[in-house]
Amino acid sequence: MAKLKITLKKSLIGRKKDHIATVNALGLKKIGKVVEHEDNPQIKGMIKKVSYLLEVEEV
């Protein structure tokens, strides 16, 4: 499977609690932090929910 490189680009201040929880579940806490995850339906769904906060690249 492909890997996805996910970067947090915007602040979590003032966001809905479920959006903050989703970003934290992806392993992102600070702006500019980068994580890699396998490309699977669960991760795709999490990315879709908070896509306005993230930058996603295929590795």
UniProtKB/Swiss-Prot annotation:
Please list the GO biological process terms of this entry: translation
State any GO CC term.
cytosolic large ribosomal subunit
Domain of life, per lineage: Bacteria
Q: Which UniProt keywords apply?
A: Ribonucleoprotein, Ribosomal protein
A GO MF label = structural constituent of ribosome
Q: Keyword Ribonucleoprotein: yes or no? A: yes
Q: Name one Pfam family in it.
A: Ribosomal_L30
Give the protein family.
Belongs to the universal ribosomal protein uL30 family.
Record's subunit section: Part of the 50S ribosomal subunit.
Q: This chain belongs to which protein, by name?
A: Large ribosomal subunit protein uL30
Q: Which organism is it from?
A: Clostridium kluyveri (strain ATCC 8527 / DSM 555 / NBRC 12016 / NCIMB 10680 / K1)
Higher taxonomy: Bacteria, Bacillati, Bacillota, Clostridia, Eubacteriales
Q: Which gene encodes it?
A: rpmD
